[in-house]
Amino acid sequence: MIEVSKVTKHFDEVQALAEVNLDIATGEFISIVGPSGCGKSTLLRIIADLVSTDGTVKKPNKGAFVFQDSALLPWRTVQGNVELLMELEGTDNKKSKASVALKQVGLNGFENSYPHQLSGGMKMRLSLARSLVLEPEYILLDEPLSAVDELTREVLQEELYEMWTRDKFTAILVTHNIAEAVYLSNRVVVMSPRPGMITDIVDIPFEKRTPEIRADDKFNQVVNYIAG
């Protein structure tokens, strides 16, 4: 479980977040939406211990962060990028574990390629493989699909959903795309303009997600409700 309690953040004279409280159950997929500058990414970085806060965050020890720009090392191959964190942790069987992770995200056969040779969607798959290879208890995702075209984005949403249902990690996604949030999440957290506060938490009433659900009237009703 992840517990966010009374999280407040100032950057000099600017208040980014005000008294944010949020409990996220183990294995839950949560998305955070809201206007630009409302503190969504700041909240994610606070949960990751990348930014300090006046409040408290309780979470499992083993987590991963997927950045918007994929944060790949250009001088390392696809295989080398996936093996990096395992090298830092002294993990055994790096090669075989990396191969499994790459197969899970559809990048088997590209082990010896370099990041500059990959499409935007492939780079994001690689970033996800690098995060999943250590079997984290939770994953924080900061707009990871924002740089790809819409068709690729929908395919990656489906793949991310499959990874989550398979590996049972807790996920927190920051996104500007409300349909994406509804497709992936158990609940969608809606934040106010700065200083960011939670104004609504919407339960998503769908058990399973398939591409066809995007055309469902109820799906679009939920999207429109969150959009206001």
Model-based region annotation:
Residues 79, 111-114:
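Signature (C-motif/LSGGQ) region and adjacent switch/coupling loops
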Residues 79-87, 95, 203:
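Short helical segment in ABC ATPase nucleotide-binding domains corresponding to the A-loop/adjacent helical element
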Residues 113-116, 134:
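Conserved signature/switch motifs of ABC ATPase nucleotide-binding domains
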